[in-house]
């Protein structure tokens, strides 16, 4: 764990084995840049990292005056430093003008600290020869790199303490999600997922209810049960319900997550290459667990319910089949034409369960469609729903948090593609196009009229698990949805 220590001193007077200097917007003339000639000799142009070994200074470029690039560069700095022999590093306080607003200083500090904290993460549980990082401490000298505008009116020390608290909570929450999503399916079963949720509940004094297949049968959650049929004897399903109840709650929010601990496609079997990484199909449910940890520790004034449908989707003699017709908890019949469109079946029943709680807002998270990745790329999540104001709020607050999001629109023509001749709805579209939206429209079939304007669907299929380093994310799971939804909840409560 990397410790960040705040010190009321100048950057020059702070003591550490190494100095970290960000070159913002190719500004090589700043007083903290000690050897401009050396940088020119090696043609360092303010991008990537460069180590001045003699002066023990690591220079890291921030391409533009942008808080998100500052976060990314801070992460790159720690990734570079963990390969070196320094135990401690010092850094000043940087502010970027792009997002200069009333809380500009706070947002810049959050970005700096979160980038630093996330830089050490690596999923190495199964590596026998782990390389422990020597880097243990970052000394933050509470001196501004440049003059801060009047929008940075709060005291530097107060803002730094608040930002550090946020970064520590968010790092812990993201890493809970990352570890869970990265866990291989031989370990990361529905029961294991429930155990992780129980640990989070115990630490945060949350209510938790873990329900088995008997409960699902009682509640007539037949769509959920169908997906688990092939795994029932070995890895039975779990409906996990976490509850955070503060003394004062302005809103009741339900967060619903798809928790497919492994998805081979069922009888509509995936090609072998497509099965690899399907441990990540629990990304939505894992995000909900991480969110409960974050929101509870931040002490948000909302009653938050986290609902996770955890199951496998496998093959076997008992597996559900194409041509089956399922009767969901909501009472609607579903024609199954593809067993690999299973996440939406689990979510349909979980969303029905969530609506029974009468929440003010419902947000579901799922690695739902490959079509979303094709349309938006692997770094961007999709937002769907009916309420434009709610969608816009999630998008703007999510983007400010550093996640990439884009809205996808429902339309009546795509809705026709999930019609069935023999049931209320079909679980797969009759067209190969618009698959991310038709999946969202399928879920819409299970949202009651009174909740249509209270519901958002977030497809995190792209960024939940990426097989390379990007932004502040290491190879594998990213914790997609956690930062965005935390920011969304905070903004939602400001309007309450």
UniProtKB/Swiss-Prot annotation:
Q: Which Pfam families match?
A: Peptidase_M17, Peptidase_M17_N
* Entry annotation: catalytic residues: 270, 344
Which branch of life, at top level? Bacteria
> Does the keyword field hold Transmembrane?
no
> What is this enzyme's catalytic activity, as reactions?
Release of an N-terminal amino acid, Xaa-|-Yaa-, in which Xaa is preferably Leu, but may be other amino acids including Pro although not Arg or Lys, and Yaa may be Pro. Amino acid amides and methyl esters are also readily hydrolyzed, but rates on arylamides are exceedingly low; Release of an N-terminal amino acid, preferentially leucine, but not glutamic or aspartic acids
| EC class (word) | hydrolase
Could you tell me the keywords of this UniProt record? Aminopeptidase, Cytoplasm, Hydrolase, Manganese, Metal-binding, Protease
The record's SUPFAM superfamilies line, in alphabetical order, gives: Macro domain-like (SSF52949), Zn-dependent exopeptidases (SSF53187)
The entry sums up its family as follows: Belongs to the peptidase M17 family.
Q: How is the cofactor bound?
A: Binds 2 manganese ions per subunit.
What does UniProt give as GO cellular component? cytoplasm
Q: Name one GO molecular function term.
A: manganese ion binding
Annotated residues for binding of Mn(2+) 1: 263, 340, 342
What main location does UniProt list? cytoplasm
Under InterPro entries, the record lists: Leucine_aapep/pepB, Macro_dom-like, Peptidase_M17_C, Peptidase_M17_leu_NH2_pept, Peptidase_M17_N
Q: Give the protein's biological function.
A: Presumably involved in the processing and regular turnover of intracellular proteins. Catalyzes the removal of unsubstituted N-terminal amino acids from various peptides.
Q: Where in the cell is it found?
A: Cytoplasm
Q: Where is Mn(2+) 2 annotated to bind?
A: 258, 263, 281, 342
One biological process GO term for this chain?
proteolysis
- Gene name linked to the record: pepA
Q: Which cofactor does it need?
A: Mn(2+)
- EC number(s): the record gives 3.4.11.1, 3.4.11.10
**Is Protease tagged as a keyword?**
yes
What is this protein identified as? Cytosol aminopeptidase
């Amino acid at each position: 764990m990397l410790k960040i220590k705040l010190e009321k001193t100048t950057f020059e007077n702070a003591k550490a084995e190494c100095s970290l200097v960000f070159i913002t917007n190719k500004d090589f003339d700043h007083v903290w840049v000690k050897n401009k000639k050396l940088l020119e000799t090696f043609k360092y142009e303010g991008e990537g990292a460069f180590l001045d070994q003699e002066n023990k200074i690591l220079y890291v470029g921030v391409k533009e005056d942008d808080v998100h690039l500052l976060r990314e560069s801070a992460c790159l700095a720690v990734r570079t430093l963990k390969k070196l022999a320094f135990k401690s590093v010092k850094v000043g306080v940087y502010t970027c003008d792009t997002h200069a607003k009333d809380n500009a200083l706070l947002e810049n500090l959050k970005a700096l600290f979160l980038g630093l904290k996330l830089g050490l993460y690596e999923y190495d549980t199964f590596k026998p020869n782990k390389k422990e990082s020597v880097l243990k401490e970052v000394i933050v000298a509470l001196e501004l790199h440049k003059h801060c505008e009047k929008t940075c009116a709060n005291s530097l020390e107060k803002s730094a303490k608040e930002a550090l608290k946020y970064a520590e909570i968010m790092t812990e929450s993201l890493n809970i999600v990352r570890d869970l999503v990265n866990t291989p399916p031989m370990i990361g079963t529905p029961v294991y997922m429930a155990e992780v949720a129980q640990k989070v509940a115990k630490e945060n004094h949350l209510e938790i209810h873990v329900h088995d297949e008997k409960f699902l049968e009682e509640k007539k959650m037949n769509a959920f049960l169908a997906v688990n049929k092939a795994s029932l004897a070995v890895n039975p399903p779990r409906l996990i319900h976490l509850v955070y109840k503060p003394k004062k709650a302005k809103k009741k929010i339900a967060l619903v997550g798809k928790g497919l601990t492994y998805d081979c496609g069922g009888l509509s079997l995936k090609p072998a290459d497509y099965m690899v990484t399907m441990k990540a199909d629990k990304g939505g449910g894992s995000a909900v667990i991480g969110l409960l940890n974050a929101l509870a520790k931040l002490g948000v004034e909302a009653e938050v319910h986290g609902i996770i449908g955890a199951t496998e989707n496998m093959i076997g003699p008992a597996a559900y089949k194409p041509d089956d017709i399922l009767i969901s908890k909501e009472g609607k019949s579903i024609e199954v034409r593809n067993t690999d469109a299973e996440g939406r079946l689990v979510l349909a029943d979980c969303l029905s369960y969530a609506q029974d709680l009468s929440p003010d807002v419902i947000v579901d998270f799922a690695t739902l469609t490959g079509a979303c990745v094709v349309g938006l790329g692997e770094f961007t999540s999709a937002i769907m729903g009916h309420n434009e104001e709610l969608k816009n709020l999630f998008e703007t607050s999510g983007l400010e948090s550093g996640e990439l999001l884009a809205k996808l629109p429902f339309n009546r023509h795509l809705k026709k593609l999930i019609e069935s001749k023999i049931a209320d709805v079909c679980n797969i579209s009759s067209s190969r196009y618009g698959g991310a939206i038709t999946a969202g429209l399928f879920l819409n079939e299970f949202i009651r009229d009174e909740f249509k304007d209270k519901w958002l669907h977030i497809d995190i299929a792209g960024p939940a698990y990426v097989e390379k380093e990007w932004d502040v994310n290491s190879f594998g799971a990213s914790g997609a949805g956690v930062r965005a939804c935390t920011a969304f909840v905070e903004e939602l409560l400001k309007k309450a």
